[in-house]
Each structure stands twice: as C-alpha cells, then as structure tokens.
Amino acid sequence: IRDYYASRGLGDVYKRQTGALLCLDVTEAVLDEAIASGCNLIISHHPLIFKGYKSITGKDYVERCILKAIKNDIVIYSAHTNLDNAPGGVNFKIAEKIGLKNVRILDPKESSLIKLVTFVPSAQAEEVRNALFTAGCGCIGNYDSCSYNTEGEGTFRAQEGSHPFCGTVGELHHETEVRIETILPEYKKGEVIRALLSKHPYEEPAYDLYPLHNSWAQVGSGIVGELEEPESELEFLKRIKKIFEVGCLKHNKLTGRLIQKVSLCGGAGAFLIPQAVRNGADVFITGEIKYHDYFGRETDILLAEIGHYESEQYTKEIFYSIIRDLFPNFALQFSKVNTNPIKYL
C-alpha cells in the first residue's frame, strides 16, 4: 500500500536494535537525541530522503543527517504513504482525536488487488485454501476466508524425470480438482505464492494471477466519519485548534452550517477536496491547502487548514502501539524534539 515514490529508510536492517526513537521528521537534532538516549533505530513518518543523491558531502541538512546516521550506526525506518493509506494509520488517529464514528476511507485505493486462481486435488483443497487464507488471501471488508470453489477435471501427462503426486509417468492422467479463486493485496503476492507452493501436493502447481481494477475500500487516502452530535462551525474550529495545538488555523468563509459529517486527510491533502464535497462532508480538514484551492468552495464545504506538522504530530502514538503489541519489552522513546519548521507570531 506504499506509493511508488515513497522512500523507506537508511542503514543495516539486519543489525540488532537496542532501542527506537519515534518521531515525525528526521533532523540533526533528532539524530543527536537518538545518540544521547542510546537508540540505534529511528522510526519516522516522513522519510529523510525524498530524492536521489549522486554525492553525499554534507552540504545540506539531509546529507549531514545521512553522514551522522552512518557514522553512529543508526538505522532509520520511515513509514510514510503506507501509514497514510493504511486502516488505523495517520487519518484514523486524527479521527480518533476528534471523536469521529463510522469512519471509512474517503478515496479508496485502486489497482492494488490481485485475484489468485489455482487448481488442487479435491482431498487437499481445504489444506491449501487455509494456507492461502493464513498468508493473507480472502479478506473483503469485514469478512475473511472469502473464496469461490468449483469442481472440475484436470489432465496431465508426467514426463521422464518427474515425480507425480498422482498418475503414472508417460500416461495421461485425469484428476478431480477444485478450482479455488480468492483475492489478495498485491504486496502480499510473494508470501501467498510461497504458501501455495509449500502446501500444494503437485510438483508443478498451476496458478494464475489477475490484476484487478477494483477499489480497495479498506485502504486509501483520507477518511470520512461523523460526530456524535452536530456542532456549529466556530465551535468545531475552536475545538480542532485546541486538540492539535494549532498556532494559526486557516479556514474559508463561515456560512452558519452545522458540522456533523467530517472529512480529513493528514499532511498535504487538498487534492481530496472534490472527493470530500462529493461525499457530502460538512468540513474538510487537512494540513496544507493552496491559496487558489479556497476559491469557490464557500457554499460547498468548510475548509480547515491546521498545518502539516500539527495534523500528523500524533503519528508517534501509532508506532508505539503497534510495536508495543508485537514486542512488549522493546525499548521505545518518543522524540521530544519539535521538528516543525514553521513558526507563528
């Protein structure tokens, strides 16, 4: 679910990690904090490297951070657009802070799903199917273990040098098989195929992979949800300003509408304004909106620009809860460095 352009990190991923510093951005001050606290792993939302480098000389802060991380044997891992797109990610954390219910993806991701079709002897179909489900197949919305199964007849002739599970070398064999169809995220393809090959009884399992253009309702950009009770525009904006400690909250003209259906996207999410309007949202909250994006929207929707840093500052809490659940005894620290480069008078 990571977008193709997103960088992921720096350093030796096989190195034993003794402690992790959790942050939004990687800066020289954050690296100094990691060194001082004995953390040899930094987990950030925004990646340090956004473009390719042909030389690293220390001429800017990114190059200085790269050199400092390498010299001090610090690994940097960044979960950027994958955390933006994921259920339970950045936007869901914002929704949690605001108190939204019935939260769902505003702009579901497309072309990220694959259909797998394979053919298995009837007696082994259940075992193979369960292995596929365990590897990540068959999840559709609030349902798992989803598949479609039809029985048919497969034929093959084993050649010299083969060791067929059924049939005889040199003779045409007919076998009653089950055609299993199921769905999976593209990023799980390798894991799923390994599971299929490990459980399928045939030497040469037949399987097909089909790219799908379906929307993936559980993954994508932005979210939309509802407040328990409607609020006035001013009441809502003041509450948002306080929750996210916003120094300067920008918004378009107040029209007296009540706010109940809320759409949002952490970071630079102005590209989702049309989707928010189409979804009938009363307000769209994001970190950055360009000047011209405000024009012509007064009657459509309330726009609220709270700042890029402010909208994503609680990302550290997501990292903490995920890692703490998986590794309860691993040393985790929240960075105390405010990396927001924007200041307000």
Where are the predicted features?
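Single conserved hydrophobic/aromatic residue that forms the stacking wall/gate
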Residues: I1-Y14
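Divalent metal-coordination and catalytic microenvironments
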Residues: R8, A34, I42, I94, ...
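Active-site loop-to-helix "anion-binding N-cap" substructures in soluble metabolic enzymes
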Residues: D12-S44, L48-E110, V120-P121, T168-H173, ...
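Active-site metal-binding loops of divalent metal-dependent hydrolases
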Residues: D25-V26, H46-L48, T81-N82, A123, ...
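Positively charged, small/polar-rich N-terminal and surface patches that mediate targeting and assembly
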Residues: K97-L234, V246-K250, L254-L258, F271-I273
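Conserved beta-sheet core of the metallophosphoesterase superfamily
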Residues: I289, E298-G307
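C-terminal functional extensions of proteins
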Residues: I306-L345
